[in-house]
Amino acid sequence: MRSSFLAFLLRKKPAPAGNVADNTRVRTKPTSVVIRQFWLLTFSIFLSTVWLLPNHYLPWSTFHMDAWAALLLCGMSLAVILRSPSVASWNSMTLMALTLACLPATQFVSGSITFAGIAWINSSYLLGFLLALHIGNRWESATPRQLADALFLAIGIASIASVGLQLYQWFRLDGIDIWSMGQGQGRPYANFGQPNQLATFLLWGLVATCWAAKRAYIGPGTAIFVAAYLLLGLAMSASRTAWLALGFFTVMSWVWRRHCSAKYMPWLVMGLGIYFVACTALLGELGELVKLPAVDPFDPSRMVAGARAQIWSMLLEAALERPFWGYGWGQVVEAQLLNGLNYPSLYSVYAQSHNLFLDLALWNGIPVALGIFIIVAHWLYKKVSAINSAESVLLLLFVLVPLNHAMLELPLHHAYVLLPVGLVMGAMDSAENNQSIFKARRGILLAILLLAFVMLVTIIRDYSRIERSYLQLRFNQVNPAAFAPPDVPDVVMLSQWREFMRLINFEPQPNISDQQIEWMRRLTLLYPSAGFSQKLATGLAFQGKKSEAQVWLKRACNVNTASQCEALQNAWSRQSKQNQWVAQVPWPE
């Protein structure tokens, strides 16, 4: 009789197994048990909640998901470091991650990054990725397959629950509103806040289902049923990225069919693909029949690149203007503002380019981006060349799913995607310990973990204060007479949001200094709202810099909505009647 996934995790002795990432040798048993089964199950359950949290609020909409994922990684990292062999292997991927983690600080010192908080946030994510690579490597080396079992169980739980939330949202039910965010407006997204993010996660759920079936934790019938259920959710997301991924899955099922124990697997994958297409086609008809919202996935307007072509063209030009050093981590908005007037208005701010490689070029310059591309491409080439089992195929697909998405959007900008990818990449590298560039004692990893934990706790502490101030701001904007302006939060790391709140409360005066102008300019390059642009343009008008004031008004209309631009124009007109300096700056044509 087939044992269940939960039964496996609660067994007292792990099943003998070879290392899933080891393609040169087979182990008859694990060298040690890193995490005991009860705690492994507990970890999986807690990890599954990362992707189910409904808290998505400005100014950092994914903060709670990312922070919870990072806290769980820190806790598990300590256990793995202390309970696994003492030597830590450093390879090209971990050295690249370490180098990247240091870059934001270097860019802040050199002036490329304008606020220390931007450097702190980006370094913390990169440090988390570095830690995940090491932990995945050590965990897989010590207890093969245990990491993948725990991770895929967590993903399986969360993906099944997420499709349930999608159905809840699509049918417009009520009763669990505090556990569900929004209705999805025709594209239910569970608690991810964005349909394409959910689609990538459901693709992970399909990989997890295949893993459970391959490891005989569930039977073939159960696996097919779960896959069909997840594909229904994937169809409801109406994600075009998912179509690319499923097409790739289908092709690869034939390319790697020799690694499948069931010879009918490619045909089964094709059948499930046809089922997905049918679900996609029927959902629109069903929604119209029962008066439920639905997005037509075959709408020609959704089958084109939309604004992406213009975004990529504009930001590629921006990257070529600073080819060697870039704009600094997290500074894509600056690139958009400085180059956007050469292109038609996008009426939106883009903090990312929607292409990982272009982001890397904008952040670090083209040479660094090319270096990262070469290292990652070489890593992928080695993993593809070394495939010799269904398990290694599934782990590679796990990494390729978000990489595919990252060419069109930004899944790897979130810790709840980046950290699991790092864990699996590290696990896949565990077979190459003997090919590492150098080895060091685990004290270095403990130091990295301590630094990451201190940064994480400080960021959580800072953001809790920022969140309170932002809530005050929202109340004040709704009813200024009843609610006071927001307090300026006392923070240690997240200085950019402290300055954001300061500028909210700041009003330019005729005697404004050059330092104050530069401070407003730096903040507006990060947060180019209509209000901040108006304040900066007013300050420039006080200094007689009429042309620059007009440029900033143009930039504001280029990246804000048409209604916001109209409101800014009306506000500037009213201000001109009351202020002689502003009156000398006509609204730009």
Regions found by a protein language model. Give the residues of each.
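Transmembrane signal-anchor hairpin modules in multi-pass inner-membrane enzymes, especially those
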Residues: 1-121, 125-153, 212-221, 435-515, ...
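Membrane-interface catalytic loops of GT-C/OST-like multi-pass glycosylation enzymes that act
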Residues: 58-63, 117-118, 192-196, 238-241, ...
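Alpha-helical transmembrane segments of multi-pass inner-membrane proteins
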Residues: 9, 41-53, 70-79, 105-108, ...
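Transmembrane alpha-helices of multi-pass inner-membrane enzymes
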Residues: 71-73, 250, 390-444
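TM-adjacent membrane-interface loops and short helices in multi-pass inner/ER membrane proteins
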Residues: 194, 309-350, 357, 364-368
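Short aromatic-rich membrane-water interface segments that cap or initiate transmembrane helices
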Residues: 57, 114-123, 184-198, 300-306, ...
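Hydrophobic alpha-helical membrane-interfacial segments at the cytosolic entry of transmembrane helices
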Residues: 150-161, 261-284, 448
